[in-house]
Amino acid sequence: MPSNSPAPDAPLAVVLLSGGLDSMVCAGLAQEQGFRVLALTIDYNQRHRVELDAARAIAARLGVERHVILPLDLRQFGGSALTADIAVPKDGVGDDIPVTYVPARNLIFLSLALAWAEAAGSKDLFIGVNALDYSGYPDCRPEFVAGFEDLARIATKVGSEGGTVTVHAPLQHLKKSEIAREAARLGLEAGDSWSCYDPLPDGRACGVCDSCRLRRAGFEEAGLNDGTRYGGG
């Protein structure tokens, strides 16, 4: 059980909690840094809906201040293997932006997190983007995070009054193995999190999508058990 419970009068931070490993570690780090966590999970009608259950489990284990699961049906737009009837690639991590990229997803999600933060009187957002062991999504890059901070300064009441909004991306330059070790250091249960984009009918992770491959390799390099049941080899 994590032991980083913040003080009752600690500042609030909105943490995007997808239910994946990176977002779980991000929430744990926010607590370790002394923030009370407002966890925001977006139910965008994604293919891998099991990650919503993972987000609930993580929020409960961490004892966050509040956990909101916000419905936003991005299947109405499509354009991604996660939100449309497009096959999830199973042939390894490539160099091009894959079809699992959801158009502008992190921009949309951070905008919603910013709205909640402003309503709650918070000036801190946390997002678990990573620019090393990742699938090449453009909205995981450092320049995206820096650009969103600039946008938040222009678009919000706190910014217009001379304040700042900080977007914390503490995993941005970590390898997946380092993220796995952070989970262990924080006392988090890796098995609470979910990474697979295309779960098997029996509930196991496919084991061969980009996200599974990155997770498996990271935990193997770290010498840790990731608590996931895999199929697919």
From Swiss-Prot:
Annotated TM spans: none
EC class of the enzyme, as a word: ligase
GO molecular function, one term: ligase activity, forming carbon-nitrogen bonds
Involved pathway(s): Purine metabolism; 7-cyano-7-deazaguanine biosynthesis
EC number: 6.3.4.20
Residues engaged in binding ATP: L17, S18, G19, G20, L21, D22, S23, M24, V25, C26, A27
Reactions catalysed: 7-carboxy-7-deazaguanine + NH4(+) + ATP = 7-cyano-7-deazaguanine + ADP + phosphate + H2O + H(+)
Organism superkingdom: Bacteria
Role noted for this protein: Catalyzes the ATP-dependent conversion of 7-carboxy-7-deazaguanine (CDG) to 7-cyano-7-deazaguanine (preQ(0)).
Protein name: 7-cyano-7-deazaguanine synthase
The organism's taxonomic lineage, starting at the top: Bacteria, Pseudomonadati, Pseudomonadota, Alphaproteobacteria, Sphingomonadales
